[in-house]
Amino acid sequence: MLYLKRKIDAFLSEWKENPDKKPLIVKGPRQVGKTESIQRFAAENYTSVITINFVEEPKYKMITADGYKAADIIKNISRIDPSKRFIEDETLIFFDELQEFPDIATALKFFKIDGRFDVICSGSMLGLNYRKIESNSVGYKTDYEMFSLDFEEFLWAGGYDDAFIDDMLTHMRTLTPFNELEMSVCGELFLNYCILGGMPAVVREFIEKGTFEGSLETQRQLISDYREDIRKYADGMDQTRILNVFQHIPVQLAKDNKKFQISKVASGARFRDYRGCIEWLNDAGMVNICYCLNFPELPLKGNYDETKYKLYFADSGLLVAMLDEEAQEDLRANKNLGVYKGALYENVVGEALVKAGYQLYYYKREDSTLEQDFFVRTASALIPVEVKAQRGTAKSLRTLITSDKYEDIHYGIKFTAGNVGFSDDIYTFPYFCAFLLKRYLAGEQSEKL
């Protein structure tokens, strides 16, 4: 089976080399490749790998019966399976499906103190168990959050190397337009990524076949699996509410005003009744929440209204798959999704920002037409980010930059179908450069220091 190179690969290697490393918890949505990446790393770096999957082998939930000390847990694992070999300094213990047995997180402190074996846990943050994991292991773990493939990892899967990606970043930093061939190649690759998304099963199938055949079916199976997870892990009556919110995301993104309106989900629905449902979907890694700023100024944290927000899919390919039967074909053939076109590009850029480490914020002033898609920040500036599905003047972006009201804003970023450019303090880049924004801004900051 084709292995997809992931960013976690380099992180795992660095983690192993750290002499003072803590047990590692790899979190992330279902089916984004956590187990596969960890198992590959383990096989290449350890003499012995002890894999405990709490879903496939629930009997291992008994290993804490005598307490949480490393020696007691190792003894109980050996009682269940005497063939497992624990070799000091050469063994990785891999606890998979952590959400099924969050109790094991309590043992991480004792494995850190013991120090003889490396420990990695992996789990999907479904239901309330992730909070139990946090409280059980605070101070004695390292966290890594994994997502579906970003566009850079998608390029790796297609055989493009770091030099290709570095060249894209150079175009941004030097404000050098891409030539016709580069625009065509990068644009087609990005369109493929928009259609497919980054779920490993979908990307692998596309790379191996070289066509979109079967991709829609795979995406829809993933959506079906997500719905089943909601039914399995969500409590009681929240199941129906969570499913209703999940189903309504594409419809609400198609509106001119993309603010998510709970009142559209069910008759008489109120935010306070659905707040936990929104948080559940976000914590499970199924959606990204974009909160409305009270005012576009620093700092961002605490400066937003939690009752006003947009909901984006954490993987844009799943958004496409939830549209009508012709959506994928229409996007490939006509490059046109009608009312959904703007929603798709917003979703893809928002997804890229989250995968780069940003939290999502937007701004809409109630008494005017002023509205801005996203905001990111550097150490000293607030940067509005515009996503234009069609060529336009970006009036809100210009207002934010030129008005004296917004002291933290000095320039803006616009992502479009067009080429690299700069005018009136607005930097314009193609959509396919969105994944590089954080690196671009880091370079801008270092030049000013």
Question: Which role fits each region the language model picked out?
Answer:
Residues E56-D89:
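Short glycine-rich substrate-engagement loop in P-loop NTPases that contacts/grips substrate
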Residues V26:
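Hydrophobic anchor at the beta1->P-loop junction of P-loop NTPases
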Residues M199, R204-A379:
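Accessory nucleic acid-recognition modules appended to NTPase machines
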Residues S37, F41:
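Hydrophobic positions on the alpha1 helix immediately C-terminal to the Walker A/P-loop
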